[in-house]
Amino acid sequence: MKITSRKVVVIGTGFVGTSIAYSMINQGLVNELVLIDVNQDKAEGEALDLLDGISWAQENVIVRAGNYKDCENADIVVITAGVNQKPGQSRLDLVNTNAKIMRSIVTQVMDSGFDGIFVIASNPVDILTYVAWETSGLDQSRIVGTGTTLDTTRFRKELATKLEIDPRSVHGYIIGEHGDSEVAVWSHTTIGGKPILEFIVKNKKIGLEDLSNLSNKVKNAAYEIIDKKQATYYGIGMSTARIVKAILNNEQVILPVSAYLRGEYGQEGVFTGVPSVVNQNGVREIIELNIDAYEMKQFEKSVSQLKEVIESIK
């Protein structure tokens, strides 16, 4: 698919949707940004607020509230709409309500004649990415969930903070569900190219126990933020904007998005967070890491949980 207008539609103007819009404008990613919400006044108000800062943006951008007809010639439709996760809830607790919302939204988008790429940020994202694909009838590669992009940035940030190293020099992934069953891939985590398990032998700032604690901290990061401020949105806003950038610029970059497995990691028939090459066509291919036996077992458990939920909402 060739990117033509750099037009992006964001559906859902809550905290996440507006954070994504704000991030895209500040990074100069789009030429036209359309906001859609069930509350038209909210969408119009957010568009006006964003427009007030356009003179300070990198590029002049058309920002407006719209409707589903605007999806027809959009390059990307980002969906963030849904019920928010509340304190004490897991992301999977949201599934039934948000699956109905997702089906309704995707149906209306496709009725417009949309022929671009979907980016899904609504939770539980792996399940709702599957629902979006199933409803749209598009090829799986054109439905991209945010997956574990946010978890991965949290992972790198926490490890970098512990080691007092720039996060950009830390490489590693969280894979599987964006949620409680996610898996830290320590077997492929490196610091400046050096495997983490080799690195900690000579580094007294971190030990094996710290690695386990760090994984748990990353897994529970959203709960901590929700307890303190009721919602998470800046991190996922920037993470989603990064995916949009990769698509619009045809980057061929590897990001841990929620992608459809066709036998990779011994799994199929499910969307989940795995390192994937992202370009203007969505997911070009999945990078299959040779993870260790423990990580594979945890990944299989994560995928199994997702499949159970998918079966329950069919």
Curated annotation (Swiss-Prot):
Catalytic center residues: H178 (proton acceptor)
Record pathway: Fermentation; pyruvate fermentation to lactate; (S)-lactate from pyruvate: step 1/1
Regulation: Allosterically activated by fructose 1,6-bisphosphate (FBP).
GO biological process, one term: lactate metabolic process
Subcellular location: Cytoplasm
Matches recorded under InterPro entries: L-lactate/malate_DH, L-lactate_DH, L-lactate_DH_AS, Lactate/malate_DH_C, Lactate/malate_DH_N, Lactate_DH/Glyco_Ohase_4_C, NAD(P)-bd_dom_sf
Modification sites for Phosphotyrosine: Y223
SUPFAM superfamilies given in the database record: LDH C-terminal domain-like (SSF56327), NAD(P)-binding Rossmann-fold domains (SSF51735)
Any one of the GO CC terms: cytoplasm
EC number: 1.1.1.27
Annotated NAD(+) binding sites: V16, D37, K42, Y68, G82, V83, S104, A121, S122, N123, T146
Protein name according to UniProt: L-lactate dehydrogenase
Native species: Lactococcus lactis subsp. cremoris (strain NZ9000)
